[in-house]
UniProtKB/Swiss-Prot annotation:
Record keywords: DNA-binding, Repressor, Transcription, Transcription regulation
Protein name in UniProt: Repressor of phase 1 flagellin gene
Function: Transcriptional repressor of the FliC phase-1 flagellin.
GO molecular function, one term: DNA-binding transcription factor activity
Coiled-coil boundaries: none
Length: 179
């Protein structure tokens, strides 16, 4: 049986940097923390925390999420387990929800170690939307707001902004792509 190499950029390329450099994400996390912005954190196993970033330790790649800004009831979120960081608009009502840290950080899937910079950058430059297929089954669509080696920023149709980590993506296409 012959092995066929996939050369399609929508499946990504092998990451040049491993482990991931979360410095750009760290800047965004600090901004969200200082401005008490409500966030939705989605893990690689589709567990969801809706709350605030109470504290952040960039050296340990660790977010402490809480149900209140700078709150004391804190859940540890490892950046290595984070699939999506979504900023929620202040106009909508959300139910705050926390899950135990061991459930959130459980790695059900192996990180892809893939880099989707090429397809995301191409869509960004062409002004077309992207469609992101997550390993755990969710499909996201929106317009890219920027990309680096480990994540892509996406503005969704409801106006929310999210950072999607490449390690938990199985494929990214342009939103106008049809199979």
């Amino acid at each position: 049986m012959e092995c066929i190499a996939v050369n399609d950029i929508s499946y990504g390329r092998e990451a040049e940097i491993w482990p991931r450099d979360y410095s750009m994400l760290a800047r965004r996390v600090q901004f969200l923390r200082f401005n008490d912005i409500l966030v939705r954190l989605v893990s690689n196993n589709a567990r969801i925390i809706t709350g605030y970033i109470a504290k952040f330790n960039p050296r340990e790649n660790l977010i402490l999420a809480s149900d209140k800004p700078k709150g004391n009831k804190r859940i540890e979120v490892k950046l290595e387990s984070l699939a999506i960081l979504e900023e929620l608009s202040g106009n909508d009502a959300f139910n705050l929800s926390l899950v135990p840290a061991d459930e959130f950080n459980l790695q059900q899937y192996t990180p892809s170690r893939r880099d989707y910079f090429s397809i995301c950058n191409k869509c960004y430059k062409q002004g077309v939307g992207i469609k992101i297929y997550m390993k755990y089954g969710q499909v996201l669509t929106g317009k890219t707001t920027g990309v680096n080696a480990c994540q892509v920023g996406v503005r969704t149709s409801n106006g929310n902004h999210m950072q999607v980590m490449f390690d938990w993506v199985s494929r990214i296409t342009s939103s106008d792509y049809a199979e």
